[in-house]
Amino acid sequence: RRRRVSVDGLRISANAHLIMPYHLLLDLAGEQKLGKLEIGTTRRGIGPCYADKAARLGIRMQDLLDPKILRKKISAALEPKRLTLRPHAKDPRLDLHAMVEEYVTYGHRLEQYIADTSRLATEYLDAGRTVLFEGAQGAMLDIDHGTYPFVTSSNPVAGAACIGSGVGPKDIDEIWGIAKAYVTRVGAGPFPTELEGELADELRARGREYGTTTGRPRRIGWLDLVALRYAARINTLTALVMTKLDVLSGLDPVCVCTAYRSAEGADLDHFPYHQTVLHHVTPHLVELPGWDDDIGDCRTLDELPEAARGYLEFVSEFLGVPVALVGVGPGRDQVIWARREAAIAG
């Protein structure tokens, strides 16, 4: 509202879990305890919140609407955490009465937006309207299919859209995957194509690659087509959106990874399931021609330099997925709708 953005259409699932003050403290304590083995979380309490959800100790949006239930649930959630939270015993954020009062106030402010969002989405679908589900993080951070334990606490893969939204798998018509023209990662974990030195610094500066939540500089590397093909498979992508193609302008050659070599010298054209193997692979890089042109004003595929089109075609052919949208700058209008023309066929 302060930014003059209407929130009239905002609806929040009554079943959505809340990150509570004690989750933040637990997240920080957990990372500090791991020391050099830390996962590199955002320390925003996400992991402990999911842990409470699995333990049936979570606080949900609907709980904010009943002070008595809220108090009982917060008290029950705090009980098994007393020992871990002992160093923070005097932290005012852990005062039960104050916490209940604060979150009941939130409930009063948000009550008009809390709804059965599953029913709402189903009604829109039944009426023939378009419903878009947007995932967060990425496939390689999926708790089941990603680079465990260096992952998030949920399932960002496409299949989880049904679980999170409460609609059925048959309601999903298209699945678009989004990938940068290079690879970034925040925090620890394997990164076969990681770059260091001046080139990494240049790409990071061009792409403004700093964590949205933490502000930490992102690790950066060449596009990993082995990992991207794996992501395309587990998400059954129907189209690919490639962003930040403009960041590669001025580089020649531009490299992509098409295979790994294991520590034992074996060539791997698939994403290895064993983390020990993944942590010790080296990338097989293919050099593609670069381009010098500023592509920020391009709005059709034909306006792109030949080398830039060749880069997109190489990626699409390798993945077997058509490119539907290309980002050529930070502006919302700096996109090429390849699907409107004819998607670059995979």
Give, region by region, the residue ranges found by the protein language model:
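Non-transmembrane, aqueous-exposed alpha-helical and coiled segments at domain scale
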Residues: 1-346
